[in-house]
Structures are given as structure tokens and as C-alpha cells.
């Protein structure tokens, strides 16, 4: 019976330490020191008036024209390859296949910056 009591005394302080590791949120913390367990509960942070005033000031100074998105990037590549007539490659007879030269390095097809690896 004494061995069970000793084992329980050894396990209980470790259980208090494990609580902080098993929690899914950082809203509370548990620590064990000398057999006592202390649970600390923190309130979630809310937006302060100072932070809200700063964000409002920041939005007021941002020029809107600079952040507008273009429909296409100015350096974006134009359509480099014309489609095959009737979607058929005249050299191989492939229907609906990729247009242009065969893959050049590492066996990759690359069109407009997108790579397909075969």
C-alpha cells in the first residue's frame, strides 16, 4: 500500500506540469511547485482606443492609387504561343495538347511562369 502512495505522490506534481502542455489555447497557464497547483487565467486582449486611432490615422495617410491592383502585371508575359488550328498539333496530330516546343530542361513544361512536371 505504501508503494501506491509513493507512486501517486510522484505522479501528481507531474500532472500539474502537463496541464500547460496539453492546453490548446494560451488563455490560461498551470504550474506546479512543491505540490501546490496555481492556475492563472488571463483575459483575452481587446483593441484599445489608442490602437484603433493609430489604424484610422494610418488608413488616412495611405495613397489609394498606389495600392490599386492592375488587371495584369506590367511585366507579365504576353501570350507567347499561338494556339494550334482546330486544337490539333500539325506535327504530332495530338488534339488539345500543349502548343510550342518540347520540354527543354529537366522534362518540365513551362508556360507563363507555371511549370508542369512530367
From Swiss-Prot:
InterPro entries, alphabetically?
Answer: SDHF4
Keyword presence, Transit peptide: yes
List this protein's GO terms for biological process: cellular respiration; cellular response to reactive oxygen species; mitochondrial respiratory chain complex II assembly; positive regulation of succinate dehydrogenase activity
Residue span of the annotated presequence: 1-30
Q: Where is this region: Disordered?
A: 65-118
The molecular function terms of the Gene Ontology recorded here are: enzyme activator activity
Which intervals carry biased composition (Basic and acidic residues)? 66-81, 105-118
**Which keywords belong to this entry?**
Chaperone, Mitochondrion, Transit peptide
Q: Name the predominant localization.
A: mitochondrion
Query: What's an example GO cellular component term for this entry?
Result: mitochondrial matrix
Segments passing through the bilayer:
none
Pfam families xrefs: DUF1674
Q: Where in the cell is it found?
A: Mitochondrion matrix
Q: Which domain of life is it from?
A: Eukaryota
- Entry similarity comment: Belongs to the SDHAF4 family.
Quaternary structure per UniProt? Interacts with SdhA in its FAD-bound form.
Function, in words: Plays an essential role in the assembly of succinate dehydrogenase (SDH), an enzyme complex (also referred to as respiratory complex II) that is a component of both the tricarboxylic acid (TCA) cycle and the mitochondrial electron transport chain, and which couples the oxidation of succinate to fumarate with the reduction of ubiquinone (coenzyme Q) to ubiquinol. Binds to the flavoprotein subunit SdhA in its FAD-bound form, blocking the generation of excess reactive oxygen species (ROS) and facilitating its assembly with the iron-sulfur protein subunit SdhB into the SDH catalytic dimer.
Q: What is this protein called?
A: Succinate dehydrogenase assembly factor 4, mitochondrial
Gene name per UniProt: Sirup
Amino acid at each position: 500500500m505504501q508503494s501506491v502512495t509513493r507512486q501517486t505522490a510522484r505522479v501528481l506534481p507531474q500532472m500539474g506540469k502537463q496541464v500547460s502542455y496539453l492546453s490548446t489555447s494560451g488563455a490560461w497557464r498551470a504550474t506546479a511547485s512543491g505540490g501546490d497547483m496555481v492556475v492563472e487565467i488571463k483575459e483575452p486582449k481587446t483593441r484599445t482606443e489608442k490602437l484603433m486611432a493609430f489604424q484610422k490615422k494610418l488608413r488616412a495617410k495611405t495613397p489609394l492609387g498606389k495600392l490599386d491592383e492592375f488587371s495584369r502585371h506590367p511585366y507579365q508575359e504576353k501570350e507567347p504561343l499561338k494556339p494550334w488550328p482546330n486544337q490539333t498539333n500539325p506535327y504530332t496530330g495530338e488534339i488539345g495538347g500543349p502548343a510550342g516546343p518540347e520540354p527543354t530542361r529537366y522534362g518540365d513544361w513551362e508556360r507563363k511562369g507555371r511549370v508542369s512536371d512530367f
